Amino acid sequence: MLPTPSRSHKLSGYAAVLFFLWLVCSPAQAALNIEIFGGGANQIPVAIVPFSGEEGLGAQSLTPVISADLQRTGLFKLVDPGGLRPHEPVEVSFPDWINRGASALAIGTAIPVSGGQISIRVRLLDVARQAELGSYVETVAPEQLRAAAHRIADMIYEKLTGDVGVFSTRIAYVIKQGKKYSLQVADADGFNAQPVIEYTEPIISPAWSPDGTRLAYVSFENKKPVVYVQTLATRTRKAVANFRGSNSAPAWSPDGRKLAVVLSVMGGSQIFLINSDGGGLQRLTQSSGIDTEPSFSPDGRYIIFTSDRGGSPQIYRMPVTGGVSKVAERLTFEGSYNVSPRYSPDGKGFTFIHRSGDRFNVAIQDFATGQVRLLTDSRFDESPSFAPNGRMVLYATEIRGRGILSAVSSDGRTRQQLSTQTGDIREPAWGPLRRLQ
């Protein structure tokens, strides 16, 4: 995380700034509220019909969650089913849905079975072709219904767009409540927020392991920045970078075996490679400036990072192997301040924070063309993080002096705001795709 415009833009001021990010704020509620702004072009009209048996589920109903998931992307136009209630393909009158303007139709059942379980069966239909596009069948416990709804939305999203859905993923972020800092993990829609660790000293830079089972982060609990890795299921953790001086900015290698970290153990802040258990220290960068905020390419061959070696904070790329004699290639040339790079999941570009005048905005740059696209028009954006399908970027911003989380589509057309009623939220990180157990 880097300074906002109201703070010093000098890289050397990073460590001091971190202590003053949340000086004054009110207690926050755990649940995130979502507001959606804008919509993508050529939205797909889809109808989600309330499932048979869903009326008995009450607040655990599936279709409201599915509809909300799809609507947040800006890619879908939800068609009101009106009084039409088919639950099986033989009950569907396709001309009626054509008249309603639906291109796709989701129908299904959610029926209680033995052991208090709920048997779910969903079909996605192509209205014009009168054919099945996909289906979802699962039996779950009542407390798993919301997760099942996200998986259904993932299926619908993938069948209609060709991209993998990310509704079943999780996000991590830091929330400040009074004098307490809490690293939390929540579902991608902001529900089911759970604290990972809490302290009265700052917690920053959460980073997900590629398999989603661990979080690396920086804690100031011992009055200095130390990098920890914590296993979410067991809540056990280990200090993996606690060298003399500053330890910060952890980034996982794609295979989960290594971490890139920023250390000042040899003087100025430089990027090092360590094993995920803290061993095997290896220096990656050697410059007269400050090198920080590393991000691995999806194939693990390169890192991009922020450095002021040229006189202003800019983004560079260099190979991971080859020793400190490797030459770093400068990537950003528009403006005097470009920071916080993160590779796109396909490796074809990266997101970062670009300063234009007094505004710090989320941007995307393409490796092949060098073209830069600004995605936001707010003033105090920071910490961008790609969704695992590359279609959205999660980031922190400020509204009326309070930190909130927002997400913007990679084309800039749709934005969603995730906020608590009060409080201050920062340091977002979008987790990887969740693997089926």
UniProtKB/Swiss-Prot annotation:
It comes from the Bacteria. Residues 1-30 form the signal peptide. One of its GO terms (cellular component) is periplasmic space. Residues 410-423 have a biased composition (Polar residues). InterPro entries: 6-blade_b-propeller_TolB-like, PD40, Tol-Pal_TolB, TolB_N. Residues 410-437 are annotated as: Disordered. Keywords: Cell cycle, Cell division, Periplasm, Signal. GO terms for biological process: cell division; protein import. Coiled coil: none annotated. It is found in: Periplasm. Part of the Tol-Pal system, which plays a role in outer membrane invagination during cell division and is important for maintaining outer membrane integrity. NCBIfam families: propeller_TolB (TIGR02800). PANTHER family: PROTEIN TOLB (PTHR36842:SF1), PROTEIN TOLB HOMOLOG (PTHR36842). Belongs to the TolB family. The Tol-Pal system is composed of five core proteins: the inner membrane proteins TolA, TolQ and TolR, the periplasmic protein TolB and the outer membrane protein Pal. They form a network linking the inner and outer membranes and the peptidoglycan layer. This is Tol-Pal system protein TolB. It comes from Nitrosospira multiformis (strain ATCC 25196 / NCIMB 11849 / C 71).
